[in-house]
């Protein structure tokens, strides 16, 4: 009730709603701002493109509740607003243990579904059944899910140099192609990338930050 009253007060002078536009939520695998790590300095900005976007629009920070694995748990928390800290520690994977057993799982994209109809789409350049994403996205109300396999497949996915997974750029191109081909200007698009998924090694040529590698003394097990 307290939050409802606060929301009503904030929205009382607003004429537009978020669901009147297309919102793209990107969870970029392993992405963080390295300039925020203490004890590390850079001769140039490692993320100039993102920084330029942040400097010209509304932006902020999101604190990740985990690192080193469990990508789908971060995704679950971002989509539902539910913290894994609220559950028993034996719950190691919400997508595999919790969501399949929920009668009506709530997720953020449903705000568009309820107002615009079938208004949410998901993209993930990997196998659709990983972490039960295919069935969970359906439970969340996504009407289409583009992945490596299945009925709706992503196309022209490319890798960078020796990297194992599809590049973020080619993933985003799939999203842009989809948006250019649809007349729907009021929808929610969920994007989960794969480019920087583990394992971590010297995949990229001409990496100007290689001299700052802090993993040279790690064992093979620690790298994984």
Task: Name these PLM-found stretches.
Residues 4-20, 25-28, 33-224:
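Solvent-exposed soluble domains appended to multi-pass membrane proteins
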């Amino acid at each position: 009730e307290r939050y409802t009253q606060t929301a009503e007060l904030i929205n009382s002078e607003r004429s537009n709603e978020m669901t009147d536009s297309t919102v793209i939520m990107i969870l970029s695998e392993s992405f963080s701002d390295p300039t925020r790590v203490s004890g590390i300095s850079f001769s140039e900005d490692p993320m100039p493109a993102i920084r330029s976007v942040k400097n010209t629009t509304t932006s902020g920070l999101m604190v990740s509740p985990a690192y080193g694995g469990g990508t789908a748990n971060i995704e679950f928390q971002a989509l539902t607003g539910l913290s894994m800290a609220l559950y028993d520690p034996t719950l190691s994977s919400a997508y595999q243990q919790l969501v399949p057993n929920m009668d009506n799982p709530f997720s953020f994209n449903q705000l568009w579904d309820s107002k615009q109809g079938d208004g949410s789409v998901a993209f993930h350049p990997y196998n659709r059944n990983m972490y039960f994403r295919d069935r969970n996205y359906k439970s969340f109300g996504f009407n289409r899910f583009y992945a490596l396999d299945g009925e709706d497949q992503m196309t022209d996915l490319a890798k960078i140099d020796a990297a194992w997974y599809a590049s973020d750029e080619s993933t985003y191109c799939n999203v842009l192609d989809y948006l250019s081909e649809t007349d729907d200007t009021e929808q929610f698009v969920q994007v989960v990338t794969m480019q920087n998924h583990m394992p971590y090694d010297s995949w990229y040529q001409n990496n100007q930050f290689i001299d700052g590698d802090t993993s040279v003394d790690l064992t093979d097990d620690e790298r994984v």
